[in-house]
Amino acid sequence: MGGSSDSDSHDGYLTSEYNSSNSLFSLNTGNSYSSASLDRATLDCQDSVFFDNHKSSLLSTEVPRFISNDPLHLPITLNYKRDNADPTYTNGKVNKFMIVLIGLPATGKSTISSHLIQCLKNNPLTNSLRCKVFNAGKIRRQISCATISKPLLLSNTSSEDLFNPKNNDKKETYARITLQKLFHEINNDECDVGIFDATNSTIERRRFIFEEVCSFNTDELSSFNLVPIILQVSCFNRSFIKYNIHNKSFNEDYLDKPYELAIKDFAKRLKHYYSQFTPFSLDEFNQIHRYISQHEEIDTSLFFFNVINAGVVEPHSLNQSHYPSTCGKQIRDTIMVIENFINHYSQMFGFEYIEAVKLFFESFGNSSEETLTTLDSVVNDKFFDDLQSLIESNGFA
């Protein structure tokens, strides 16, 4: 179990000969929803030996990791009595947490954030934390519906297309409104963990986010200190991407749209995002940490984690943690739970997702063949080739 031949090593996957985080974003040719690819992904979730046997073909790393046979019952959750008399302070303020999601649409960011909340709630180390997701897309839809009383209007020109790079200012406005809502509710003690759910796909957007975090933490009027955690969600399995695009065609933007129109519009939207996307890297992590330390004038906490292909690909050499010398128990406990969630995601949740993808493609032979034909006509080899070209034009292949 866990072995594969060279002939199927990239079947249905995006290439992943790892030198840096950027190399994750590279497409290869192959069956978009090959049964062999999905079966292999299923086995990968079940087989801990897979990660050691395939380091060179997935993510090259010399750091081994123990995978528990029972990831839902991990040692850190046992025999622990929470010490509520030991709060952690930074700059004289009680700490709260902000998780910044990064990732292209249709990679699973929202699903993974809901799984993370479930994990935090089920662990005695963190079950007292109040968690809330702040989704920029939902804020956009709320504002749009309040303004025009309609779902998303599909555009015919680049000037009307919200997701066209020419209209970045509009997207940035919605993101800033969402971010300010997160700060407001954190400051009013309405939640303890705020998850900023947006693509956050450019260096400029991320720079703005952390400038705002610094401003919040150094503002004398703010009641709490935010500990930033970066969670990048990536997907380079063609079957997963295709399945996710199918599901996106049923979200709130497309409730009143025909299936084919929804698929075409979302595929176009995805190309726009690929044309601007810059993966978060360790260099950017270090730059942000230096920036925060300089502006907050203290050695501050900063953490970076990755979930790749529903957790099947091991991101060991990408993850990064910085604990200041004065880091308290609350931060260490919370990060330990999150890190454990990341390390065991494929076994805790990924297997179920991969099985759903397999069932989706297998079931078309018995039911909605027209739907699959429509999906194939849009999300095909040419579509993935176009995405690859966009990646290469950005210098991230």
UniProtKB/Swiss-Prot annotation:
Gene3D superfamilies cross-referenced by the UniProt entry: P-loop containing nucleotide triphosphate hydrolases (3.40.50.300)
EC number: 2.7.1.105
InterPro entries reported in the protein's UniProt record: 6Pfruct_kin (IPR003094), 6Phosfructo_kin (IPR013079), P-loop_NTPase (IPR027417), Pfk27 (IPR014379)
Enzyme active site: D197, C235
UniProt-annotated binding residues for beta-D-fructose 6-phosphate: R269
Any Pfam family: 6PF2K
NADP among keywords: no
GO cellular component: cytoplasm; cytosol
Annotated segments matching region 6-phosphofructo-2-kinase: 85-305
Gene Ontology biological process terms in this record: fructose 2,6-bisphosphate metabolic process; fructose metabolic process; regulation of glycolytic process
Membrane as UniProt keyword: no
Record SUPFAM superfamilies: P-loop containing nucleoside triphosphate hydrolases
Keyword terms of this UniProt record: ATP-binding, Isopeptide bond, Kinase, Nucleotide-binding, Transferase, Ubl conjugation
Transmembrane segments: none
Annotated ATP binding sites: G103, L104, P105, A106, T107, G108, K109, S110
Induction field: By glucose and fructose, but not by galactose or maltose.
Residues joined by cross-link Glycyl lysine isopeptide (Lys-Gly) (interchain with G-Cter in ubiquitin): K55
GO molecular function, one term: 6-phosphofructo-2-kinase activity
Catalytic activity from the UniProt record: beta-D-fructose 6-phosphate + ATP = beta-D-fructose 2,6-bisphosphate + ADP + H(+)
Role: Synthesis of fructose 2,6-bisphosphate.
Protein name: 6-phosphofructo-2-kinase 2
Organism per entry: Saccharomyces cerevisiae (strain ATCC 204508 / S288c) (Baker's yeast)
Organism classification: Eukaryota, Fungi, Dikarya, Ascomycota, Saccharomycotina
The gene coding this protein: PFK27
